[in-house]
């Protein structure tokens, strides 16, 4: 099939030769393009106007090519030239043959013919050129002249030839010294690289860029700077007599090819060091800092003593009286001139003073989104926190805010012991006893160090044998039949067939997640489309898919697959697909009707994540449009009526589980310290109650570890007077082998107590639990709009959560639930249900997705629980400032591109800016590193060594560039696992970052963007990140460390940051972490002018009348060690003197 036939077939959607021939006949019969379009439209075949033009133009192009080819065939001379080209250079192109023939006819001699071909870099050697000229004898050439008008070269080709001729005429005959040329890296060696130089008429013009001339910084390996085949700009610095050319890449802008101005500033210029990491880009060069008053005084003294020169400090010339005795200079002619006779130009001084002034940046409050001017809620605060408690001033909420004294005391006790042990180590190291064996001394020091590392409870836990929970010898088919859901298989299948929407309620461990998808597949539902199942967490999606693949008997990615962010393990044969709810939400962006699926199951719907809530509305809409689509909602809670009501009052099916009565015991009075009360309750149960294990719900890792340590010490103190008590922790950060211990049967005569987070409410089921201790608190994630962060805070749980915790005690037999709060608090201070995530989290990414789907009226969107209006307005304002929304609130072209990336809008904004700034390769790498967990790890027994290794990766400009250093060096080490072990890096996290980078690169390729490297230019990378994170900027404050410009929140640099202990005037942060105070995480220094350049709509330069300067307070110097901070005042000094002399006023 010809190219034109393939094109027509692709447009009409058929490979039928009869249809293609029919279309070709219409083209032949049509006199012109307009007639052809009319004939096509009469057919009503659904072919667009643009496709009609494409077909017609392709047909005409093919005809022109055939004409040229026929002319070549009909001309004996053309055939001979074509044969020579075919034999000598393996080229069989009639257009090239006609082109060579036209040059031959215009040339008066062989010399002129040879020059013309060489000028155009035709690649033909002299022997081939001579052969062609010999073929055309003079009589034949004259004969061909008459034929020439009928064999005209097409106009486009002729214009291109003229353009090439002009380019060739402008080329240098040979390389010119100190001129910059474009080149291509041909070969890389240990001492540099060889570059093919373009822009000269010489063939194969090569030169060497020595390793010392490859970068302004010191280069250890040429591969760090260039790669083979890369196009670069080079300067010719030397041409030897033997023709060898030396090249340089130093001080050359690799984007424009311009020579940068050499940095001639003194290295010792007031501490302004010529840092190896500093960019030479003069456009982004850091301006000189203005001198402070103490510095001015000190410099004036140095100049007066002759130790410094006034010429080094031009800004002080107008302040210092010039003394002719030491400020005399010689003119070029040898005459002496006094320093006070020549004055600096006033305009120049003023310009220099302007340059040294620091830029003061403040918010631009005048420019806001016009479409939100009338939308502000009356009486609502701009940064109002989401309401997550029923009674904010209630006793439970006050207990949550104040925290536990027991935890605080335990923390302080550990710190005191640590200091004592450190003091003993120092004493042992300083005391050199000559009678003592040095080996014994070293062992004593090591024993003391080990006490610093682990507590008694941790040491006991380390000595336990590692196991992986309960094992079973049953075959997989028998295991499936033991699950509670198996007995309801036929009822479930029939319910799915009869209803479009279905709600299934089943306890954790009933088998609903792994079995229902298989039942539907076995019953043939997958014949009409995939069976999809969403999970709220990535780990769950991957692990469940692997388990189901094992049960089905296939490899993951074939019949059963999974999709999580930046990882798609599915294939064309996949029938059952597990995925995170966020990934299905992204699929809805491209396919709103979910046409690939026959059944979609929203698992763990009771968790009410933001993505799940959005999917409720999207799937409800898709199912109404597609009656054959089935939607199943599964939940582990009994409160399922709300789901049923939302999905058009659909049926609810309960999977029965083993449930026994549970006795609820409330506290008689409010507990002052819920941790102390929980520990006392555990001891009381262990001593006074019958057999059965205990489950205690706590809020997080620190509480769990502290409780385990305190309880271990108390049980050890009681000794044999009580039975054996096994203490087990459960939280997500624990290794899986330690977590799995909770599932092992308790040894006879013992009791186990499990301290767990709310993961034990629904996600896991522990057999043997008869007693539940519920303090009534949990950590909840909320969005703090003022700080622009999501933070975990301790808050009272809801009544639904309390009932779910109670139910954990009734799985094995009749149980008891000890609620460490009053019955009044349960009914009066707890909300009925937990506040859904969509009502307490940042919605910027969610709203961007909805806007990309064409949903502009968000107030009318069918949310199950609509988010607060102020939360939506904050998200819309953020998107407007990121330029993804226009003045009418509609998605811009930039916003459409941002929605294609599965990441936060700030990251996608930086990513797209990197394309314009030509540093996309580095930005993709850094974003990949930010998308994974912390790549550094600090083993407790080797913390100093780990910190030392980490410091080697530190970049002086901050953490974003530090992460780039880590990935680049790991890449240079060939992605070695051993390299990670040596440098205390998480190999698994780095491997994940590499996968994420690969996925982002694929998205880049898919949408036609290029990955370009800027060779780690720090200024370019930092400025690119500012384009996305300009709202996360902070300015140094002399009293509190830093204050965010947007919101004025007092923050500090996190101790793990590479900038910790350093002071930059302006910094940018990725997020804020709330621990003992609010810390900026992933911090990078920036220049204030960048904020004004990339976000003039958000920031403006401050002046004398600006609000920030008006509010600024002059705070006097003080001695932070002095008891009386007013001791420096004159009045204080006078009073002290009077007291000493006994004078009374």
Swiss-Prot record:
Gene3D superfamilies membership: 1.20.120.1080, Nucleic acid-binding proteins, P-loop containing nucleotide triphosphate hydrolases
Domain S1 motif, chain residue ranges per copy: 178-250
Secretion signal, residue range per the UniProt entry: none
Listed name of the protein: Pre-mRNA-splicing factor ATP-dependent RNA helicase PRP22
Compartment list: Nucleus
Residues spanned by motif DEAH box: 603-606
Catalysed reactions listed for this entry: ATP + H2O = ADP + phosphate + H(+)
Subcellular location, principal: nucleus
Segments of this protein annotated with the region Disordered: 254-281, 421-442
This protein's record includes keyword Hydrolase: yes
Domain Helicase ATP-binding: 493-656
Family, as annotated: Belongs to the DEAD box helicase family. DEAH subfamily. DDX8/PRP22 sub-subfamily.
Function: Acts late in the splicing of pre-mRNA. Mediates the release of the spliced mRNA from spliceosomes.
Residues that, per the record, bind ATP: 506-513
Pfam name, any one: HA2_N
Record lineage: Eukaryota, Fungi, Dikarya, Ascomycota, Saccharomycotina
GO biological process annotation, one example: generation of catalytic spliceosome for second transesterification step
Biased composition (Basic and acidic residues): 254-278
Helicase C-terminal domain boundaries: 678-854
Stored InterPro entries: DEAD-box_helicase_OB_fold, DEAD/DEAH_box_helicase_dom, DHX8/Prp22_DEXHc, DHX8_GH2-like, DNA/RNA_helicase_DEAH_CS, HA2_WH, Helicase-assoc_dom, Helicase_ATP-bd
GO function terms (MF aspect): ATP binding; ATP hydrolysis activity; RNA binding; RNA helicase activity
CDD domains per record: DEXHc_DHX8, GH2_like, S1_DHX8_helicase, SF2_C_RHA
Enzyme Commission number(s) from the entry: 3.6.4.13
Keywords annotated in UniProt: ATP-binding, Helicase, Hydrolase, mRNA processing, mRNA splicing, Nucleotide-binding, Nucleus
Organism per entry: Saccharomyces cerevisiae (strain ATCC 204508 / S288c) (Baker's yeast)
């Amino acid at each position: 099939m010809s190219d034109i036939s393939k094109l027509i077939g692709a447009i009409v959607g058929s490979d039928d030769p009869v249809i293609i021939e029919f279309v070709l006949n219409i083209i032949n019969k049509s006199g012109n393009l307009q007639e052809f379009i009319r004939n096509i439209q009469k057919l009503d075949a659904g072919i667009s106007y643009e496709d009609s033009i494409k077909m017609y133009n392709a047909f005409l192009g093919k005809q022109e090519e055939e004409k040229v080819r026929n002319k070549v065939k009909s001309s004996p001379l053309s055939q001979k030239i074509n044969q020579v080209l075919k034999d000598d250079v393996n080229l069989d192109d009639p257009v090239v043959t006609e082109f060579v023939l036209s040059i031959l006819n215009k040339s008066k001699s062989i010399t002129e013919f040879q020059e013309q071909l060489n000028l155009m870099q035709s690649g033909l050697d002299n022997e081939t050129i001579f052969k062609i000229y010999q073929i055309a004898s003079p009589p034949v050439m004259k004969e061909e002249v008459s034929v020439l008008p009928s064999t005209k070269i097409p106009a486009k080709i002729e214009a291109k030839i003229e353009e090439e001729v002009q380019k060739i005429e402008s080329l240098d005959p040979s390389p010119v010294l100190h001129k910059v040329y474009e080149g291509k890296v041909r070969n890389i060696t240990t001492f540099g690289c060889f570059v093919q130089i373009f822009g000269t008429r010489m063939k194969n013009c090569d030169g060497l860029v020595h390793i010392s001339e490859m970068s302004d910084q010191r280069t250890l390996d040429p591969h760090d700077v260039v790669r083979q085949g890369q196009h670069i700009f080079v300067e010719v610095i030397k041409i030897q007599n033997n023709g060898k050319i030396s090249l340089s890449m130093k001080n050359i802008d690799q984007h424009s090819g311009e020579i940068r101005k050499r940095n001639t500033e003194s290295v010792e210029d007031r501490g302004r060091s010529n840092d190896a990491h500093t960019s030479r880009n003069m456009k982004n060069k850091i301006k000189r800092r203005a001198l402070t008053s103490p510095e001015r005084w000190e410099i004036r003294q140095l100049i007066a003593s002759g130790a410094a020169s006034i010429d080094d400090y031009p800004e002080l010339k107008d302040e210092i009286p010039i003394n002719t005795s030491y400020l005399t200079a010689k003119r070029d002619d040898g005459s002496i001139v006094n320093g006070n006779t020549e004055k600096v130009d006033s305009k120049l001084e003023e310009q220099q003073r302007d340059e040294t002034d620091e830029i003061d940046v403040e918010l631009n409050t005048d420019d806001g989104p016009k479409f939100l001017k009338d939308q502000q809620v009356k009486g609502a605060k701009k940064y109002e926190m989401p309401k997550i408690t029923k009674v904010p001033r209630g006793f439970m909420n006050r207990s949550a805010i104040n925290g536990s004294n027991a935890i605080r005391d335990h923390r302080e006790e550990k710190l005191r012991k640590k200091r004592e042990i450190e003091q003993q180590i120092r004493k042992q190291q300083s005391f050199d006893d000559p009678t003592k064996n040095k080996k014994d001394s070293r062992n004593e020091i090591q024993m003391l160090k080990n006490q610093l590392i682990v507590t008694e409870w941790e040491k006991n836990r380390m000595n336990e044998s590692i196991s992986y929970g309960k094992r079973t010898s049953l075959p997989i088919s028998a295991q499936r039949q033991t699950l509670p859901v198996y007995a309801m298989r036929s009822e479930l299948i029939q319910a799915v067939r009869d209803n479009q929407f279905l709600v299934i309620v089943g306890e954790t461990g009933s088998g609903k997640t792994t079995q229902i998808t298989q039942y539907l597949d076995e019953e043939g539902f997958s014949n009409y489309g995939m069976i999809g199942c969403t999970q709220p967490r990535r780990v769950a999606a991957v692990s469940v898919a692997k388990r189901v693949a094992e049960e089905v008997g296939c490899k993951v990615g074939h019949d059963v697959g999974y999709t999580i962010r930046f990882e798609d393990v599915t294939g064309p044969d996949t029938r059952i697909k597990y995925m995170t709810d966020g990934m299905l939400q992204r699929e809805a962006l491209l396919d709103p009707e979910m046409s690939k699926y026959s059944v979609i199951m929203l698992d763990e719907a009771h968790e009410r994540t933001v993505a799940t809530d959005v999917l409720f509305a999207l799937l409800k809409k898709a199912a109404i449009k597609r009656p054959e689509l089935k939607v199943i909602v599964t939940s582990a809670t009994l409160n399922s009526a709300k789901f049923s009501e939302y999905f058009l009052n659909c049926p609810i099916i309960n999977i029965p589980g083993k449930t026994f009565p549970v006795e609820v015991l409330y506290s008689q009075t409010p507990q002052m310290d819920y941790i102390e009360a929980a520990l006392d309750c555990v001891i009381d149960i262990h001593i006074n109650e019958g057999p059965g294990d205990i489950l205690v719900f706590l809020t997080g890792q620190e509480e769990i570890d502290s409780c385990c340590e305190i309880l271990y010490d108390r049980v050890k103190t009681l000794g044999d007077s009580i039975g054996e008590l096994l203490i087990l922790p459960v939280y997500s950060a624990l290794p899986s082998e330690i977590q799995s211990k909770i599932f092992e049967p308790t040894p006879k005569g013992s009791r186990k107590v499990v301290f767990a987070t709310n993961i034990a409410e629904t996600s896991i089921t522990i057999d043997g639990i008869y007693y539940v201790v519920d303090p009534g608190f949990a950590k909840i994630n909320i969005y703090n709009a003022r700080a622009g962060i999501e933070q975990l805070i301790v808050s009272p749980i809801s009544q639904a959560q309390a009932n779910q915790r109670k139910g954990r005690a009734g799985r094995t037999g009749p149980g008891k639930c000890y609620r460490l709060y009053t019955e009044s608090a349960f009914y009066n201070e707890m909300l009925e249900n937990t506040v859904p995530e969509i009502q307490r989290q940042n919605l910027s990414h969610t709203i961007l997705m909805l806007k990309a789907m064409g949903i502009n009226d968000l107030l009318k969107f069918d949310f199950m629980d609509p988010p607060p209006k102020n939360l939506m307005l904050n998200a819309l304002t953020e998107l407007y400032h990121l330029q993804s929304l226009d003045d009418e609130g509609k998605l811009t072209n930039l916003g459409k591109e941002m929605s294609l990336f599965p990441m936060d809008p700030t990251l996608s904004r930086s990513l797209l800016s990197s394309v314009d700034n030509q540093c996309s390769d580095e930005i993709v790498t850094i974003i990949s590193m930010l998308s994974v967990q912390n790549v550094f790890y600090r083993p407790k027994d080797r913390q100093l060594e780990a910190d030392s290794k980490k410091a080697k990766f530190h970049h002086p400009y901050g953490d974003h560039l530090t992460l780039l250093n880590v990935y680049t060096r790991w890449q240079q080490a060939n992605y070695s696992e051993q390299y990670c072990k040596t440098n205390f890096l998480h190999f698994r996290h780095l491997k994940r970052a590499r996968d994420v980078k690969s996925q982002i690169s694929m998205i880049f390729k898919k949408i036609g963007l290029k990955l370009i490297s800027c060779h780690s230019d720090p200024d370019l990378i930092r400025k690119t990140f500012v384009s996305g994170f300009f709202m996360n900027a902070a300015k140094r404050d002399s009293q509190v460390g830093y204050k965010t410009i947007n919101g004025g929140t007092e923050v500090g640099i996190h101790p793990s940051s590479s900038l910790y202990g350093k002071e930059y005037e302006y910094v940018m942060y990725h997020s804020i972490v709330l621990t003992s105070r609010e810390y900026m995480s992933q911090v990078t220094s920036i220049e204030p002018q960048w904020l004004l350049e990339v976000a003039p709509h958000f920031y403006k330069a401050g002046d004398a009348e600006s609000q920030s300067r008006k509010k600024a307070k002059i705070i006097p110097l003080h001695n932070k060690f002095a008891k009386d901070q007013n001791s420096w005042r004159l009045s204080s000094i006078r009073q002290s003197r009077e007291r000493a002399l006994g004078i009374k006023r």
